[in-house]
Amino acid sequence: MTSPKGKPSPKRSAPAPATAALTPCAEERTEGATSSASASASSHISSSFDSPRDDTVVLTGYTAESEHSAHGYERLHDIILQGSDTDADSEDGRANEDDVILFPHAEELSNAAAGVGGDDDNGRVVRLGTTQHLDESDSSEDEPTLNRVGDIPLEWYKDEDHIGYDIEGKKLMKKERSALERLLEATDDPNAMRTIYDALHDEKKTLSNADLQLIFNLQRNRTTNPNYDMYSEVQEDTVVFDPLNHPLARSGGPSKKAFVPALHDMKVIAKMVRRLRKEEAERRLRPAKEEKEEEDQLLWDDSHVEMDTHTHFKYFNRIPKPKLPPPGTFESYRPPPEYLPSERAKQRQARLRTIDRKEHFLPQSFDALRHVPFYHHTIQDRYQRCLDLAFFPRAQRTRLVVDPDKLLPELPDPKDLRPYPEKLSFHYKGHTATVRSVSVSPNGQYLATGCDDHLVRVFEVQTGRLMKRYDMGAPVQQVEFCPSTSLNILAVAVEYSLVFIVPTFAAHTLVNDHTIRFLRAPGLSAGQREAAHALGAVDTLGGRAVTQTALDADETAHEATADLHDIEEREKRAEFVDASAKERNAGIVVKIAMHAKVKKFCFHIKGDYLCALCPKDHVKYRQTIMLQLSKRKVFCPFRKFSEVVTDCRFHPREPIFFLATTNSVRCYNLMAHRLQRRFKASGGVTTCLSIHPEGDNFLVGDTTSHTSWFDMDFSDKPYKRMRSHKGVVNALAFHPKTNAYPLFATGASDGQVHVFHGMVYDDYNKNALVVPVKILKHQRPVYAVAWHPTLAWLFTSTEDGVVTAWTE
């Protein structure tokens, strides 16, 4: 017999007639009546319920896709009930309410299978749902299996053109049908709703009504025979119970309350249960104690000796005595010849005192060890050894092993912090001496350099072309472009003067005219300026002749300090001098004469104010001079200032002035005219100063190779102190656009320029991030560094006159 899914069923004994009537038989393929009955059933399966055959039940609305689901069988059951309503009403009441008859003539067929019918039906099996009558021996179990591949997965043949082999070893070829053919076949076939696919034989089989009834009963745990009574053999109890004659009934019986546990007992039991659970939980938490086997005690075991705490600690924490070093070649009885002392060495050893001798013997050579005499200092050496052990305490120190890499902070990879200058792109040649200063124009198109060969050179950044050269007549200390884009000013510090140049090629004509009007003296006509300049009679472009006159007058005034009429001369701070005709042709507009050599100066961000430093001025308050160019005003803000100044800077956003001295940085409020804060610069003498464009942080370089990062919101002491150079830090600078390029660079006398990534966060909970990213190397000491205003380019100058541009 074949299962509904097409798999061969195991062999079993011949069933009884009643059971055989309910076995699925749609798979049987026999000759004669079987073929004709199946053909006739298939031809009329699609007919309606108006004119059904007497021995055939027509099922509609059942699909093959739902043959394996409970929902499909429930739907099939409903269809069968609907089809049997009319016939059930016409019956004469033979069916009881307890009988399970799902379609017409089922009871009649089952009776025929059980032998209840007429004489003609004896000895024959009637299959439900058909009119086919077969012999009892004709069963699906006797039908041979065509495919003899055995009990193996049929998926093994899914890629083959056959499904197995028959009994003669011939291939059983697959019936190739496309999806369209299967769809049309399922549409045209009236038995498609009860047709299943036999994968073993690659054919379709139609389920009969009996097969469907059998599946329906098995799914609901019912017997296959609807007439089977499972309680037919149960014997009824014939004993009659008389409650009046029962012994418990006579006395009323025990009370039900006697069988209910007492409430007090329940509480006691619950308490005992809780105690047991608690002990069990504690037992699980306690570590399991390993049962130690009994061992023989050691007779001389010191661990079981009773002693006080101090003795116990000293005994078990004793430190072994240091061992004597093994004898060396010097103490050998046959040392190499170079170890044997000469006569002069023997005499020198004899002249030394005993306490001054390193060794109490001199090396000697013996032919054999038995020839070595007794060592006379044995007792002294042993005694000295005992003194060392007794009077020199031994201490045990725990050695702290720390990985040096773990002490370093976790910093991002420098490759992730690009762009930053890392390759040499331009050389600006022509300098014959030390270049002490470089400056880039506000638009980033021109580069100005100040050299000790008395020349100021202006180069075009992109091409390296020399645009203009100015002869100052003296070594140039510093050059700087005005940071304001509305003014085209190049300021130069030359010994005792500040020279203001208007490079006409660097800006538009309107900007140049506005700059010249800005620098001219207010209230003076052009003729008055010519007369004032003719009085000076200066022909050189430098400031030596102009400033020397002021210097001589100042020194003469200080020599006659007793004269009251020299007070006004001593109080003179600086003097504005208009340029001569020759100087104006060269681009020089005005010069400012100082009393001492100008070391450094800086512009305000708006370009109107300027501060100059003259640290060698013998008048202390004149070491720091502030100038207002538009009104030609000169004033010294620090009247009682005695420290030596090194650098100065204006705050980029607020009226705050930073002044660096030898050991500190002072922060002044220019509006309140008072000292706001003082930052202690630990280390050597400060050399340079740079302010962050945001104004809350600044850098200080000193002579001890340190670069200190100060955070004004953090403390008066350095937030970070970096020693990356091996020489004096001569220059440092922040990038003007730190929002786009958070970079700063330091240059030192060791010939190196270190580029750092310095990110300042707006969140006060985050500290500034400082990461070294690149080292740019030169052959000679670096004196100046300057950033491009819009790009991550760095310009440097060295002692040998090399000016370079490093690009990203």
From Swiss-Prot:
Q: GO CC annotations?
A: nucleolus; nucleoplasm; PeBoW complex; preribosome, large subunit precursor
**What are the GO MF terms of this UniProt record?**
ribonucleoprotein complex binding
What keywords sit in the KW lines? Nucleus, Repeat, Ribosome biogenesis, rRNA processing, WD repeat
Where located?
Nucleus, Nucleolus; Nucleus, Nucleoplasm
Instruction: Mark out the compositionally biased spans (Low complexity).
Output: 1-25, 33-50
A biological-process GO annotation: maturation of LSU-rRNA from tricistronic rRNA transcript (SSU-rRNA, 5.8S rRNA, LSU-rRNA)
Q: Main location per UniProt?
A: nucleus
The free-text function statement in the UniProt record for this protein reads: Required for maturation of ribosomal RNAs and formation of the large ribosomal subunit.
| Protein name per the record | Ribosome biogenesis protein BOP1 homolog
